[in-house]
Swiss-Prot record:
Catalytic reaction(s) noted: L-prolyl-[collagen] + 2-oxoglutarate + O2 = trans-3-hydroxy-L-prolyl-[collagen] + succinate + CO2
Entry-listed glycosylation sites: N327, N458
EC number: 1.14.11.7
Record-given protein name: Prolyl 3-hydroxylase 3
Tissue specificity as recorded in UniProt: Detected in kidney (at protein level).
Compartmental location: Endoplasmic reticulum
Amino acid composition bias (Basic residues), ranges on this chain: 722-732
Species for this entry: Mus musculus
Cofactor: Fe cation; L-ascorbate
Gene field: P3h3
Motif Prevents secretion from ER: where in chain: 729-732
Sequence positions that bind Fe cation: H580, D582, H652
Family: Belongs to the leprecan family.
Residues forming the catalytic site: R662
Amino acid sequence: MLRLLRLLLLLLLPPPGSPEPPEPPGLAQLSPGSPPQAPDLLYADGLRAYSAGAWAPAVALLREALRSRAALGRARQECGASCAAEPGAALPSQLLGAPHPVSGPGVWEPLLLRATLRRAECLTQCAVRRLGPGGAARLRVGSALRDAFRRREPYNYLQRAYYQLKKLDLAASAAHTFFVANPTHLQMREDMAKYRRMSAIRPQSFRDLVTPLYWAAYDTGLELLEQREAALALPQLEEALQGSLAHMESCRAACEGPEEHQGAEEEGEGSQGGLYEAIAGHWIRVLQCRQHCVADTATRPGRSFPVQDFLLSQLRRLHEAYAQVGNMSQAMENVLSVLLFYPEDEAAKKALNQYQTQLGEPRPDLGPREDIQRFILRSLGEKRQLYYAMEHLGTSFKDPDSWTPEALIPKALRERLREDQEKKPWDHQPPQQKPLAHWKDALLMEGVTLTQDAQQLNGSERAVLDGLLTSAECGVLLQLAKDAAQAGARSGYRGRRSPHSPHERFEGLTVLKAAQLARAGTVGRPGAKLLLEVSERVRTLTQAYFSPERPLHLSFTHLVCRSAIEGEQEQRMDLSHPVHADNCVLDPDTGECWREPPAYTYRDYSGLLYLNDDFKGGDLFFTQPNALTVTAQVRPRCGRLVAFSSGGENPHGVWAVTRGRRCALALWHTWAPEHSEQEWTEAKELLQEEEEEEEEEDILSRDPSPEPPSHKLQRVQEKAGKPRRVRVREEL
């Protein structure tokens, strides 16, 4: 415990001279010299003014709320740095492992607590000077408001208020700032398109007011390197690295604030046990938060996953750029810094040998960058404590770094952590393309033919197959969809305008709803049975074609019809279904696809089985990740299946249906059995129950004393049980 508390106080000391993060552009202080007001009150007043249509007061209050929130973070970081640099702030030598430490039980305790009290006094006085009396407590906000600021919601209100005030350039800046962090926000996507069509708005107004500047420097540096302008790229890359380290310091300073752990303490996690248990619990949460700052710094706004080895990637580019301009000493510093992360990195060792050869003489004075050495030593010290707590106190810790030496992890934890990393690798690995011969050997069903393979469709893991349905089977399923739509007013499942286009009507039917309607006599039972049989037919073929080594499970089955609304098709410019991927959020601007909600991340393969072709438009098309360049197009017809992997390698959309009614069976498959479609099983059981009841009725009809109808009805109701809830999801 003594060693743990020594390290605790050592790591509480941030490096002196930490750079101060700049205030976000566009948030100039509205009341110079005065301490900030409570951000929660300012934000609430701003929303009230917004709701009342008082646009100018709303703008002033919302901007002041943002400034006040930023002021607290700056004050906390500056106070931490200044208190650590004060004379006498050093810890007593006895707590730092001096050659002759104080002996005796409890002798170290007064020294530890005295140092803690002095630091607390310094931080409190600094907060009073920066924020006013009681400022730290007054400016504390709850988790809901912190989340709102993290999602940049104030900028959503600001853009609307600026628009009402006819300040279009400011509106565009606020809208762009919100959209960067919320790229899937459909309303803001439409608003951004409108702003870009306005000639009065200058192109430079579409700027992010919040994103740390190091991202812009990083992107600029990469672009210059691609253009082989290493001399111009170096200042940008250095700025990006220093900005990344400064952002990490700001994030770490925020970890020491009480509000970051308020939620855990409210749930009682930090209030159990005595003094030392409370200290250890709070300190562990601080360390967990600090370690997460690596991922926070490496995560672009609007993304949920960080850039892998972000600092390391910057160091690699720096040593290569310095070598290109002939600065071998700086190149050696940066490549030696790379080797601090991965000592056995072959590419880095090879580059180091080249640089040493070009220098011509040994340079013992050259070593890794000091800022990177401090970062690694501090990070390893924190990891060591977290793994100790994980082993002995039962806490949790997810290491954000892949470079952590295995020797640092206690042996008792290594196997457990290795098992956790090996769980469900298909959740993270994209499907691998298989040879063409494999595709042709997978056609097992009689009458099914391969019309186009992945190569002919200009992509990977996509195929078009014909012959899965006869014309009679297509007719049965089309009649099922028609009967279900006509029964919509009675069943509560009426058609409605498409969620993807106001110019089309959308009708959907799940397998369970079809079975329920069939049991009620609203639709024919043959159609409901065929829907189940066909979905299993598609699953079997998709598994044989794409995934013979691993079972696929139906995840969701949906019979969908889209009908063109008459009189609303002239000069139509939209799509029936916008370009998207099925298991990840597609970002056309960067070409990346993020496997995260709201996407159905557990989907692995998709299928579209078409029922008709007597309509205009409605072709399926695949695009490049930019969602603009069409790579392949497929015309629907009865019995044609388009099957493909569900990830970002297969962005797709549907052209507008401008006449007629387009019907298809949409199916999604998963490798994860826990995400298999439960409604499919329920629908099958429901139809089997009905068959059994009909057989029993046939037997009873030959019985001289049949059961009274009232008793029969009661028995059927008891057997059916409670009505099942129907999930209705708007799918392709």
